[in-house]
Amino acid sequence: RLLASGAVVPRVPWYRGENPFPLLAATLSPDQQRQWGEDLAWLARLDEAIGAADGPTRAELLNRTVRLAQRVFPDGELGERPSGFLYEDREAARSWTDPLDDAPFAQDVQVLGELADPWVARSHIYDLMVTRFVSLFGSGGVCKDPLAFFMTLAHAPDGDEEMLRAAGLDYAAGPDTERAALPGGLSGSPRHLGAFLQPVAPSARTYAAGGGLTVVNAFTNANGSLQARFHRLLGSSFRERLATRIRTAWGTERVLEIQASTECNTGQAVSCGLLPPLGLPGEPGAPDMVPLSSLRLVHDPATSTLFLADDAGPVGLAYLGLTPQYLLGGYLSWLVLLSDPWSRLPPFADHWTSRRRDLNGPLPDEVMHSERAVAGRLVTRRESWTFPAAQIAPLMDRDLTTTLLHMDDLRKQWGIPVEVFVHQHMPSQGATFDQHKPRYVDLSSPVSLLALRGWIDPDAAHISFVEALPARGEALGLTQDGEPTVAEYLVGLQWPKDLGGMA
């Protein structure tokens, strides 16, 4: 209402693709200029400098950016001082064959699709949204102000019991073929699931012949968002192919992109611009933008779904942003739910989140051993051993020889391999907790154990050792120079929007 009345007027500080640092510098007072002006001027030239630099120079430029970031974020502001690790996504000159051309790998993907199928189901929170729409506008009703409806949902109190119950049902849900068969609406995406798959074998020939293993590292979505983050890097041909695939999957030529570039972080803008934008309050305009205010929200009683439409018919919605859907706030979270109404939590990946869902409570003060879980050649869980931290800390002696002997005894007692990934479990996991990434450790290497000793947090409650797959000699990727490196494939599974389709 404030926007519509003109009482609040959005002011876009800079436009997408524009260098923000000169504009930021122009807003500084003389005192601020003396303090920050030199840094902002250097940042303004950074993009051009990186583009012209060779590898070592580019790394040094990024390291200088790291040091600047560490000065900007003091201790305590975001939980801990940033680690200073920056990376850049780069295209590779080396060409790769499509792994799905190999029949054994394609069979792995088929098996995974069959396992995950009943776990990719319409969410209960989407059902609640439909129920509340019908209570306001009736079965088959039409809402002429979709933004107002979504904002009404967003302003529900924190203690909304129905919302909490629906969210809990989604988190705890198991396989449900009936809910997997429910439609997601004309505006929504097809059912989808992305999987990070890692090949493991002593040689590429062995793997192509059906030997070795395929590890399911993690799940994500498969609506095109992970590919969209690279569309500016890979060019217009890639962008057009991806946009065409999205329209085909949605089953309509008109798919609008929810471009939440102002939400949470400035990195959101990286993936924007693949499809015509849905016009939202505070977002930059575009010539092909379709304002949300020009659309109607409609209930389809035959499918118990909602969709957006105008006089020309229904329109699809796609959210391709970097910020995960569950972290979006306000009305955006409900608008994105309309575009992606699926719950996707199959327990067939070796990711931190998937492992945590297996626990009914806190980790016990005893050793937990979990066997490797397999389905054919697929590894859906690596073998792991979780110890109370108090049992591991005394083994990490200042004398490296003593540490090596202690670790050798531990390995023999529990059958732990030499190469492992190590997780540390902290007693308190607040909003800024980011210790999900494991550390590779060679338990027979003094240097590796010394690094582990310095890495483990004194406050850690438990330490997990997870078998390293792939281990040395089992990585099937190749660098541009032909050196072995780790390879990981992102495979997208989509089920057609018509009922009964296979992935």
Say what each PLM segment does.
Residues 3-268, 433-438, 445, 451-503:
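Type-3 copper protein
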Residues 218-473, 478-480, 487-501:
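C-terminal structured domains
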